[in-house]
Amino acid sequence: MSMVHGSSFQIAQDGENENQGVQRVKKAGLTARGNVAVAKRSALGTITNQNIRVQPSRAAKSGNADCQDENVFAKQKSFGSSNNENKGFKIHVDEPTVQVLTTATLKTTRQSEDEDIKLNDQVTSLPSLQALEDIQVDNENGSPMVLDVTIEDAEKKPIDREAIILSVPEYAEDIYKHLREAESRHRSKPGYMKKQPDITNSMRSILVDWMVEVSEEYKLHRETLFLAINYIDRFLSQMSVLRGKLQLVGAASMFIASKYEEIYPPEVSEFVYITDDTYEQKQVLRMEHLILKVLSFDVAQPTINWFTDTYAKMADTDETTKSLSMYLSELTLVDADPYLKYLPSTIAAASLCLANITLGSEPWPSSLAKESKYEISEFSECLQEMYQTYLNAPNHPQQAIREKYKSSKYQQVSSISPPSSLSFTM
């Protein structure tokens, strides 16, 4: 056993000796062929900018170094200190020459320029120009350069919202059709006053008369007044109100309509003031919230005022006829009975027809019947009741609307006497 192990160990040692011999021969051959003394490299040499590691040349690449030799630049360059010191790069800039001009220099320059100018004798010898002859222009023939100062600027009228909408012919018919469908939705109940335990029709008439005065005091649009009364009737159709809170309902409704329609609506403090401080701001705001909740925030409703203005534009009526139809439309606001049972478009058609009859015009032109989709037979009943209201207007307890339309702004149409009878053909 010991011999076997000993012989094995001897063989291993001989193999190692043989390998060492081969390595010595290879090293000697490399040294002899390359004639390069390979320095013994220490584990961690001194790292400086001067010591550049150059790989030893191999026997296979002992020839001239070509462009693909990775050490060719290492042999040529050194990134250490250079013999040439770093010098700053300078750019030469010429200093600007400032020329100081004096009075003498300017005079000399001008004299030299004048001396250089020499006029040709042929130019100076030209005859002088003769004066142009006066040309007579006949202004009566309408010269394009003559302004007609006799034309006076027409009085500029404020542009209202309805006029802008109806001025678009592509959409006017669709808008009218849509509003005719919308007026049937969310209507107030005609007989709601019978279910109110503490208020009556006369109290409502007083409230409407007061709201007409408020709208005139604050110069609110007519549409604002019609919207506010629409909110009141719809609210009272669903809610019972005590007489002490009826004016609060009217003030809050006017406040909502003003914020919807007006550009600069009155502040809530103004509506407290017009009630003679009967209510506080907190109460007006709470009632506003309650009304909007009951109405489901549906405040965009087509009114009698909108349809009346639309029919007047369709018929191309004059200002007197339009003002009279507006006056008749507002008279229907005071009395809930019987006008709540009619659609706003029906009342508007009847008011314009009655205005035409009063002023001696054609009651309902065929062109208007075609555009409005209304015939006289469809609103004849409303026309009869409106005629009775027109006759009884001077004797009505509430006179705010009549006083309003006595103004020259509305051509004093409330002073026009109603016709003796309704004479028209259906």
From Swiss-Prot:
Pfam families: Cyclin_C, Cyclin_N, Cyclin_N2. One of its GO terms (biological process) is cell division. It comes from the Eukaryota. Residues 1-11 have a biased composition (Polar residues). Keywords: Cell cycle, Cell division, Cyclin, Mitosis. One of its GO terms (molecular function) is cyclin-dependent protein serine/threonine kinase regulator activity. SUPFAM superfamilies: Cyclin-like. Residues 1-22 are annotated as: Disordered. Transmembrane segments: none annotated. The keyword Cell cycle applies. PANTHER family: CYCLINS (PTHR10177). Essential for the control of the cell cycle at the G2/M (mitosis) transition. Interacts with the CDC2 and CDK2 protein kinases to form MPF. G2/M cyclins accumulate steadily during G2 and are abruptly destroyed at mitosis. Belongs to the cyclin family. Cyclin AB subfamily. This is G2/mitotic-specific cyclin-A.
